[in-house]
């Protein structure tokens, strides 16, 4: 599968992007993965995204001196070396990965259409959050995409993985660089940026 790697400094970390072309994917490409047998029953889309995500993760791990491919955990999560944390996300034909010494989460999303935003609003934010988003100065579809992505990154960065849903992660404040999110006894500062029609969020949880 043809891939292109780029990197971008963001919020004190380096994001590693892998653009990939699903059209020229073949099953033999998966043999690069030590755990390729675990993907034999996956669909083509899942296989291409997984492969690109692991390629991005390998680039991210090289920063810290590791030469390994994250395995698949019991909950289908990436398994990182014991001394580091990492996160992977996908959007369209782009995979993104980041590695850190602290718990970290990253997410990449295409900006919702107005119709999608309307359909998903009640599943992502509470009425109180809706008011905060209305005052943030962004178009609502963009603001909701950002809220969704920020909550995804906060969830990934949380050391306590629970069955908490989007509405359990409450946006309490917002500025041009960060979204502050509260869940039970935890606070999350989520950095964000817009890149063309894409929203990228990153949360490092100290």
Curated annotation (Swiss-Prot):
Q: EC number(s) of the enzyme?
A: 2.7.8.-
The pathway that the record names for this protein is:
Siderophore biosynthesis; enterobactin biosynthesis
- One family name in Pfam for this protein: 4PPT_N
What's an example GO BP annotation here? Answer: enterobactin biosynthetic process
User: What keywords sit in the KW lines?
Assistant: Enterobactin biosynthesis, Magnesium, Membrane, Metal-binding, Transferase
**Keyword Cell membrane applies:** no
The enzyme class is: transferase
Instruction: Cite the Gene3D superfamilies for this sequence.
Output: 4'-phosphopantetheinyl transferase domain (3.90.470.20)
- Major location (coarse): membrane
What does the record list as coiled-coil region(s)?
none
Quote a single Gene Ontology cellular component term. enterobactin synthetase complex
Q: Which family does it belong to?
A: Belongs to the P-Pant transferase superfamily. EntD family.
Q: Subunit structure of this entry?
A: EntB, EntD, EntE, and EntF form a multienzyme complex called enterobactin synthase.
Q: Which NCBIfam families match?
A: PRK10251.1
Identification of the protein by name: Enterobactin synthase component D
């Amino acid at each position: 599968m043809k891939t292109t790697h780029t990197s971008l400094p963001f919020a004190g970390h380096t994001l590693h992007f892998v653009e990939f072309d699903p059209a020229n994917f073949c099953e033999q490409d998966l043999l690069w993965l030590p755990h390729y047998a675990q993907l034999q029953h996956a669909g083509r889309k899942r296989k291409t995204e997984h492969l690109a995500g692991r390629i991005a993760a390998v680039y991210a791990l090289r920063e810290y001196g590791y030469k390994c491919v994250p395995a698949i955990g019991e909950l289908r999560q990436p398994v990182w070396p014991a001394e580091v944390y990492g996160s992977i996300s996908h959007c369209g034909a782009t995979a993104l990965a980041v590695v850190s010494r602290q718990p970290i989460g990253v997410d990449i999303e295409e900006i919702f259409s107005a119709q999608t935003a309307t359909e998903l609003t009640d599943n992502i934010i509470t009425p109180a959050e809706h008011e905060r988003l209305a005052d943030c100065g962004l178009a609502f579809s963009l603001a909701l995409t950002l809220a969704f992505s920020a909550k995804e990154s906060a969830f990934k960065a949380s050391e306590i993985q629970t069955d908490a849903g989007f509405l359990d992660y409450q946006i309490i404040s917002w500025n041009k660089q960060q979204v502050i999110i509260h869940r039970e006894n935890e606070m999350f500062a989520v950095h964000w940026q817009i890149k063309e029609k894409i929203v990228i969020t990153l949360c490092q949880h100290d």
